[in-house]
Amino acid sequence: MKKIFVLTGEPSGDKLASTAISKLQKDYTDIEYLSVGGSNLKKIGIESIFDLKEITYLGFTSVLLNIFKINKRINQTVEEILKFNPDILFSVDSPDFTLRVAEKVKKINPQIKTIHYVAPQVWIWRKGRVKKIKKFIDHILLLFDFEKKFFDEENINNTFVGHPLIENNKNDKTDISNFISNNKKIISIFPGSRKSETNVLLPILIDFINMMNKRNLNYNFIFHATEENKNIIVEY
């Protein structure tokens, strides 16, 4: 039986991973899974070695204060992956966590194939990372077609797969016409997938909305949030 370890670092990655893996489960029923994941992976029957919330911190200060916990979880994750001995380590987004784990795993056991989903934005910042990534990532799955040229030029194996959440939502659109005014412009607000992000940013975003409404009433503000964060926004 083949084994896949699914490695995520935040709720948005958990959602992306569950969408991709659920499709794989339909075609291949003889694969064993283990993960660092959240509620979405759990819904499709994949257990996590610890709660994803334990590694989702917002901002430099928060990360710094919890650096020993984070490093402990990184080392624990590496140990659990090596013990599970998967054929594939499937890491998703959150490069500061997932790629650090993948690098350590590959160094100890080069036989484990490493596939990373959601390319780190190395063409924007920290371009030097790409040469390092090439040493321990076997294949990168790309969300956006413009990324392919960059990774081709760097001789990194890659495949453009598109964004599954966008594809899935093409036929699953929410009708907001009942609660917005047609003569008003829409401002979309994305507070992030992590609860810590939403809790920190929500007061600032609400102040922004109130400020804008005092200046101009010609706007509708639409929040785009994960299922987990919806109640935080509604109850604020």
What label would you give each PLM region?
Residues 184, 197-236:
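Donor-nucleotide binding loops and adjacent catalytic segments primarily
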